[in-house]
Swiss-Prot record:
Pfam families: Arg_tRNA_synt_N, DALR_1, tRNA-synt_1d. It comes from the Bacteria. CDD domains: Anticodon_Ia_Arg, ArgRS_core. The lineage of its organism: Bacteria, Bacillati, Bacillota, Bacilli, Lactobacillales. The gene is argS. Belongs to the class-I aminoacyl-tRNA synthetase family. This is Arginine--tRNA ligase. It is found in: Cytoplasm. The keyword Cytoplasm applies. One of its GO terms (cellular component) is cytoplasm. It comes from Limosilactobacillus reuteri (strain DSM 20016) (Lactobacillus reuteri).
Length: 562
C-alpha cells in the first residue's frame, strides 16, 4: 500500500458513501511541507452536505483513523496528514531493498499485447539525427509499458517501398557505379538520391523515370527487385550497427514492402463497403464527416499510396498479435494522417480503430537548424554517437585518469548523454542538439545522473555493507526524509509516464533524485561510524538501485564507476 493509499484508507472510514479510489483521486500533495505530506480538500462536499468546508473538515477529522500517522490536523477547508516519517521511511527502504529490480512496478497492462512501431528509417539512406527521437522515445515508452505489465512487440517498420525508391533506381541507372556503391553503399546511394532531387526541377523527366521504376517494382520486374533487395540489405546492416550502440532490439523488421503484398484485402474491403470514390482518375475515401481531408488510396497511374499499405499493416498486426494497443511513434506533422487512418478503419467497420494511437514528437534541430535528407544536410547519428563517446572519454580521463574500464564507461556515458538529452524534453516539444551542452557532468544531463549513481556506489564500496536485512531502517534520520519520501514516489512517476507515453517524466524524476541525493551527500556524513551508519548506507543503496532502474527505463546504462 502506498502512502497515498494509506491516507485514502484512513479517510474511507469517515466517508463511507465514497469509493476509496474516488477519495484517492482527491488527495493532494501540499506545496509547503509544513502543511503535511498529504492534504484532503473538502470544498466538493459542501454542496451535498450543505455545510461550510471548514466545518466538514473539522467533523471528518474526528472520524479519521489516525493510526500510522504522526498527526492529522485541520487547516481551514483541508485535512492535512503528517506521516510517521521513521516508520514510513523504513517501509519504503525495505520495499526497495527487498526487490530493487521490480520496485515501482504496477499492473496496468495485465500482460496484454501492445505493438509499438518506431525508428522506421528509410533504406538507402544513413540513419540521421532526425531518427534519434522516434528510436529513443519508442524504446523508452516500450520499457515503461513493460514496467506496468504490458507485453511489447517492437516493430521497425522500414521505409523500404514507395516512389522514392523508383527515384533512386532511376538515379542508379543514370549515374550508378557498382564498385563505388560496394565500397561505401549508404553514402553513395544518398549522393545519388540527393542529386536526382536537386536536378528534378530542371529535368522533370527524372521524376517521371522514378515513377516508372516504382511501377516496375510493384509489378515484379526482375532488375527492379534485384536493386531493391541489394539496397535493403546494405541499409539494414548499417542500421543494426547503430541499434547495437543504442542497445535497441526489434521483434520485426517487416516494412512497407511486406505490407505491399497484403494490399488486396483492404482495397477489397473498401470496395465492398462502397467507400472508394473516383476523383480525377484516382480513387479516394471521403472523410468529410470527420472534418478530415480525403484519403488517396489508388493514384491515377494505378499505383497505391502508403495509406493503403498502412491499412494492410493495421489489419495484419491486429490479426497477428491481438493487440490491446497499436502505437506509432511518428513526428507531430503526421497528426492529421493518423486521424485519417483511424477514421478509415472505423468506416471499414473495425471496432478496434481506437486502439491505433499516435505518439507524436517535435523536431530535432541541430544548432537551431532542421535536417532534411532531400537536400543532403543529413547528420549521421552514428557519427554523433562516436563524437559524444570521444568527448565523454576526455572528460572521464580528466576526472578519473586511473579508471580501469575507461573505454566501456565512455561508451555508456557518451551514448547515454545523447539519449538523455532527447528524453528529458517533453516529446512534443522541439529539441535543439548541441554536443558540448549534452556531454556535461553538471546541469540537467545524463552524465550528471550517472555520476550521482556512481557516487552512491563508491560510498557503498567504502562502507563495506551490502546486506541490510538486519539494519534498523528507522535510524536513517530526519534529514533523510525528503530523499526517502521522493524514492517512495517512483511508482507514481512510472504510472504517469506510462499513461501519457512520456519518458520525460522518468528523466525528470531521475534528475530530481540525483539532485536530492547530492544535497543529502553534501550535508550528511554518510560514512561516520555511529549507530545510524548502516541505515544511511541502506538509503544510499536504495538511491543507487532506483537511479539504475530509472536510467534503464530510458535505455541508459548506469556505470558503477566514473
Amino acid at each position: 500500500m502506498s502512502d497515498k493509499q494509506q491516507v485514502a484508507a484512513a479517510l474511507a472510514q469517515a466517508l463511507p458513501e465514497m469509493d476509496v479510489k474516488e477519495i484517492e483521486a482527491k488527495i493532494e500533495r501540499p506545496k509547503d511541507s509544513s502543511n503535511g505530506d498529504y492534504a484532503f480538500p473538502t470544498f466538493f462536499l459542501a454542496k451535498t452536505l450543505h455545510k461550510a468546508p471548514q466545518m466538514i473538515a473539522s467533523e471528518l477529522v474526528e472520524k479519521v483513523d489516525q493510526n500510522g500517522f504522526e498527526k492529522v490536523v485541520v487547516a481551514g477547508p483541508y485535512i492535512n496528514f503528517f506521516l510517521d516519517k521513521a516508520q514510513v521511511g523504513a517501509k519504503i527502504l525495505q520495499t526497495i531493498l527487498a526487490d530493487p529490480e521490480h520496485y515501482g512496478e504496477i499492473d496496468l497492462g495485465h500482460q496484454s499485447n501492445v505493438t509499438i512501431d518506431y525508428s522506421s528509417p528509410n533504406i538507402a539512406k544513413p540513419m540521421g539525427m532526425g531518427h534519434l527521437r522516434s528510436t529513443m522515445i519508442g524504446e523508452a515508452v516500450a520499457r515503461i509499458l513493460e514496467k506496468v505489465n504490458y507485453n511489447l512487440i517492437r516493430i521497425d517498420y522500414l521505409g523500404d517501398w514507395g516512389t522514392q525508391f523508383g527515384k533512386l533506381m532511376a538515379a542508379y541507372e543514370m549515374w550508378g557505379d557498382e564498385a563505388e556503391v560496394k565500397k561505401d553503399p549508404i553514402n553513395t546511394l544518398l549522393k545519388y538520391y540527393v542529386r536526382i532531387n536537386n536536378e528534378a526541377d530542371e529535368h522533370p523527366e527524372y521524376t517521371e523515370a522514378g515513377r516508372n521504376w516504382f511501377a516496375k517494382l510493384e509489378h515484379g520486374d526482375e532488375e527492379a527487385w534485384r536493386l531493391w533487395h541489394w539496397f535493403r540489405e546494405v541499409s539494414l546492416e548499417r542500421f543494426q550497427r547503430v541499434y547495437k550502440m543504442l542497445d535497441v532490439n526489434f521483434d520485426s523488421f517487416n516494412g512497407e514492402a511486406f505490407s505491399a503484398q497484403k494490399m488486396e484485402e483492404p482495397i477489397q474491403l473498401l470496395r465492398d463497403k462502397d467507400l472508394l470514390k473516383p476523383s480525377r482518375g484516382a480513387e479516394i475515401v471521403d472523410l468529410d464527416e470527420y472534418n478530415l481531408p480525403p484519403l488517396l488510396i489508388i493514384k491515377s497511374n494505378g499505383t497505391t499510396t502508403y495509406i493503403t499499405r498502412d491499412l494492410a499493416t493495421a489489419l495484419f498486426r491486429k490479426r497477428m498479435y491481438g493487440h490491446a494497443k497499436s502505437l506509432y511513434v511518428v513526428g507531430a506533422e503526421q497528426e492529421t494522417y493518423f486521424k485519417q487512418l483511424r477514421a478509415a478503419l472505423k468506416e471499414m467497420g473495425f471496432n478496434w480503430w481506437d486502439q491505433i494511437e499516435h505518439i507524436s514528437f517535435g523536431l530535432m534541430n541541430l544548432n537551431g537548424k532542421k535536417m532534411s535528407t532531400r537536400k543532403g544536410n543529413v547528420v549521421s547519428l552514428e557519427d554523433v554517437l562516436n563524437d559524444s563517446i570521444d568527448l565523454a572519454r576526455k572528460q572521464i580521463a580528466e576526472k578519473n585518469p586511473d579508471l580501469e574500464n575507461a573505454d566501456e564507461v565512455a561508451k555508456e556515458v557518451g551514448v547515454g548523454a545523447v539519449i538523455f538529452h532527447d528524453l528529458k524534453n517533453y516529446r512534443r516539444n522541439a529539441v535543439n542538439f548541441k554536443l558540448e551542452d549534452v556531454v556535461k557532468f553538471e546541469g540537467e544531463t545524463g552524465p550528471y545522473v550517472q555520476y550521482a549513481r556512481a557516487r552512491a556506489e563508491s560510498i557503498l564500496r567504502k562502507g563495506g555493507i551490502r546486506d541490510f536485512s538486519d539494519v534498523d531502517l528507522t535510524k536513517a534520520g530526519a534529514e533523510a526524509w525528503e530523499l526517502i519520501s521522493f524514492l517512495g514516489q517512483y511508482s507514481e512517476a512510472i504510472k504517469r509516464a506510462a499513461l501519457n507515453y512520456d519518458p520525460s517524466v522518468i528523466a525528470k524524476y531521475a534528475l530530481e533524485l540525483a539532485k536530492k541525493f547530492n544535497q543529502y551527500y553534501a550535508h550528511t556524513r554518510i560514512l561516520d561510524k555511529d549507530e545510524a551508519q548502516p541505515a544511511r548506507l541502506a538509503l544510499t543503496q536504495a538511491v543507487s538501485d532506483v537511479l539504475k532502474s530509472a536510467l534503464d527505463l530510458l535505455d541508459i546504462k548506469a556505470p558503477d564507476e566514473m
